Amino acid sequence: KKRKKSVDKSYYVMYSIRQSGVLSVDIQLKKGILDVCVLHAISKGESYGYKIISDLEGVIEISESTLYPILKRLETGGFVTTRTAEFSGRLRRYYKITKSGLEKLFAGRSDLQEINVIYKKIFGGRL
């Protein structure tokens, strides 16, 4: 059965719960969370790959092989802009959030808050 594209978030999260009671985070949900985290890191000011990874350290583990496709997707979507500049004899790509990126960040934060409310209702705030 195909799911409708605009599915209520509470249903979507509930659908992801397995019989064991462990929340199975769907790939799309992971993408959304990672996008929000990366946009948040960039929203603090122009940044580059290694700095973004460092800024997110202790919050979420993200590798270069995960980060760069996210950045490319965000750039293609118009959520970040890039510029290339030389740093210590090497070219470095800098990322800057756009107005659309800020809107996506705020919407993503709102979605995460809704998911958190659902999680607390299901699990009583405990893992």
Where are these regions (language model features)?
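Beta-hairpin "wing" of winged helix-turn-helix
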Residues: 77-91, 96
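Alpha-helical DNA-recognition elements
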Residues: 69, 73
